[in-house]
Amino acid sequence: MTGAWIRAQGRQLGPIVLAGPILAGGAVALLGWFAADAWPPSQAMTLVTWLAQVFVIATGVCAAVALTGDPLLELHESTPTGFRRVQLTRAGLVTVSGLSGAAVMFFPLHAVRAWPHDQGWSTVASPTGAVVIVVVAALLTAAFAGTASTTTIAVVAAWMFLAMLWDPYVLPLPQQRGIPLIVSAGLLVAVWHRLGDAERNIAKVVTV
């Protein structure tokens, strides 16, 4: 995978999709920093908790747009690049942006002790793991459904699962992020095989 190929896919996605997670992470860090300076620690952490969820949703939406926003995406199957290569490259670009945004968000808030349930530098695994999970959810849904609306719904569902059903009750970080990431790795295998099915990829173009 050449640098020219990656740059070409980056241009297709556009600066908003590529920079969206980083900008969201920076905004959360800035607001959290101000809150930590002006409010009691408990109130600042509560605000950061909710703002961090906005960052995860923003990253997931960027992934959904990246993976479904091109109406001619499946036509790459008729070229030497292949549909799977295109989708995995685009998912990878959003993931890198999301991981960067998570770092931009976490480390300043960790420095001012405004990050909730902070267990040290390793706590960065919480937002970075969430990024990977929602991107995999977007990639999986885009691979099998292919529509922007369904993919966005899947991203929101993955976020709701983490924010409301998983993270509040599974506090040890290795289990909190390790188990969903193991499941995500298994789902990536299914995505790999589905995106490699040239007949289904071409059939999607024919039926559109």
Annotate the PLM regions:
Residues 1-49, 140-144, 156-208:
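Hydrophobic alpha-helical transmembrane segments
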Residues 4, 69-70, 135:
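A generic alpha-helix surface/boundary motif
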Residues 15, 19, 76, 84, ...:
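Secondary-structure boundary/capping residues
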Residues 62-95:
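Helix-loop-helix units of permease transmembrane domains in multi-pass membrane transporters
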Residues 69, 113-114, 147, 198-201:
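Perimembrane helix-loop junctions in membrane proteins
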